[in-house]
Design a protein with these regions (language model features):
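Generic structural hydrophobic/aromatic packing signal, biased to beta-strands
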Residues: 24-26, 30-34, 68, 80, ...
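A generic secondary-structure signal for well-formed alpha-helical elements
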Residues: 34-41, 150-161, 310
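A general structural signal for short secondary-structure junctions and capping/turn motifs
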Residues: 68-71, 93-98, 119-121, 169, ...
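Extended, charged alpha-beta segments that form solvent-exposed binding/catalytic grooves
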Residues: 105-193
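A translation/RNA-centric and nucleic-acid-associated enzymatic feature enriched
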Residues: 110, 180-345
Length: 345
């Protein structure tokens, strides 16, 4: 609630019915284009996993997964996924995909410890994708090439939506700007990571921040990253400036995945070297899993961005604090109030 933004004179251009149609338009166009450009095949994915496998995403290391016991299996624990970052790499091998081929899936997750605001919800929906690469592709040039491909899909989607809806103006720049987290800290040494993201994104329009997770010269990382999927030297976030809320909006987090050397190093840095003995992590060390690149792209985030919405609750159904509902009820338009209240009826 403390980070809730109530933009002045905000008015949703679409009612509830038309918003649902527009959401489908965004999702259908973008995912088809992404699959074509990255050579991805859609697959089904799990909602929950066995915690003993090490397949769940540990995010920043402190978020609690939703856990439940399975009656038929003597109350054996299962965890609702935080993301499918690790599962996808395992699936590529299991399903027999080859170099240059990949998968994408609709990922639904519950993040119970999320602090909600205009762009954060306890319900997370994203396209999770993963692609097999050659070992020699594990470099910044290949990462940048893939980022440019994803960004072109975002620009094409904005252009398509601007044709469908006359209130949508084109705001994404032609090219995305690349910068490492250390270079960004050097530019704004006296600011927080979030402030740095805001300043660079407002200046450039669309930014790819690379090399996130390791400690910077200041002694702090730009942001937290789990140590066992992204290689911290070869990952990236795609952010765009969003004028509706005057913020830097992250649309995608992606990266080239860890090899044996990066995994062992990052587990040691994160203070959890024992995780190398879990089945997933062990398969990386043993070299039985393919080299991959992958990421997640927020479905509600891009719908919110392309439809110029002020709150993620306008494009997804979730649960919100009562004070959030009350604050929006008196400031933001009627449609927004109704949608936030759907789950209280």
């Amino acid at each position: 609630m403390e980070n809730l933004i109530l933009p002045k004179q905000y008015k949703s251009e679409l009612n509830l019915h038309d918003t649902q149609l527009a959401i489908k338009t965004v999702k259908d166009f973008f995912q088809a284009l992404l699959a074509q450009r990255l050579h991805l095949t859609r697959v089904s994915a799990p909602l929950f996993v066995d915690p003993a496998t090490g397949l769940n995403d540990n995010l920043n290391g402190y978020e609690r997964p939703v856990t439940f016991g399975i009656k038929e299996q003597d109350d054996k624990n299962a965890e609702v996924v935080h993301s499918l970052a690790k599962w996808k790499r395992y699936a590529l091998k299991k399903y027999g995909f080859q170099v240059g081929e990949g998968i994408y899936t609709d990922m639904n997750a519950i993040r119970r410890d999320e602090s909600t605001d205009n762009i954060h919800s306890i319900f997370v929906d994203q396209w999770d994708w993963e692609k097999i690469i050659h070992k020699e592709d594990r470099n910044l040039d290949y990462l940048k090439e893939t980022v440019r491909t994803v960004y072109k899909c975002l620009r094409k989607t904005e252009q398509y939506m601007a044709i469908q809806y006359d209130y949508i103006d084109l705001i994404l720049p032609k090219e995305i700007f690349f910068i490492t987290s250390q270079e960004l800290e050097d530019l704004f040494p006296d600011n927080t990571p979030k402030e740095r993201e805001y300043y660079i994104t407002k200046a450039k329009g669309a930014v790819c921040i690379m090399q996130i997770g390791d400690t910077l010269e200041s002694g702090e990382p730009h942001d937290g990253r789990a140590p066992d999927y992204d290689d911290w030297a070869l990952n990236a976030d795609i952010l765009v400036y969003y004028p509706v809320l005057d913020i830097a909006l992250e649309l995608s987090s992606m990266g080239i995945r860890v090899d044996k050397t990066a995994l062992i190093s990052q587990l040691d840095k994160a203070g959890c070297p024992e995780r190398k003995d879990l089945p997933f992590q062990k398969s990386i060390i043993d070299g039985t899993l393919p080299y991959t690149i992958g990421g997640g792209i927020g479905q509600s985030r891009i719908c919110m961005f392309f439809l110029r919405k002020a709150h993620i609750g306008e494009v997804q159904s979730s649960l919100w604090p009562e004070e959030t509902i009350a604050a929006c009820d008196s400031v933001i338009c009627f449609f927004f109030r109704r949608l936030l209240k759907l789950n209280t009826i």
